[in-house]
Amino acid sequence: MYKKIFFTIIILSMSFRSNSEIVFTDKFTSNNDWKIITDQVMGGVSQGKFNYKKIGKDYAIVLTGNVSTKNNGGFIQIRRKLNNVNLNQVKNLTVQAKGNNEKYFVHLRTTFTILPWQYYQSSFVVGNNFKNFVLPIKNFKRSGYLLPK
């Protein structure tokens, strides 16, 4: 089966909060923080790219691509590491995004997610206008029963 999807998602801000205190905010100003990963790492043929775009006084990260289920593929993603950021008390991840009326997923990895296919996941559906999505950390679902809750 071959399914080709072109999409664009624009994320204006991303922040981790512990109650009302912001622990970390990404302003999307460094080209070195984010990396693109596609299903090509496992033989897929999906293609994607991202860039930074100024929207008003803020910067956003824009992810675009073609996703194909050919060769057992079907994903593109952007990823960044959070070094020297203590997230132990974080309650929520807030994403401000817009896109093409599709469902998107946030995957969090921890020191327990050793294998590449392990993660904690939450989803949200973007529309044509920017919207804040507050994703409680406690609602992220683990990708396998071997991961702690």
How would you name each of these model-derived features?
Residues 4-14:
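Sec-dependent N-terminal signal peptides
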Residues 2, 16-149:
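Beta-rich carbohydrate-recognition modules and glycan-binding surfaces
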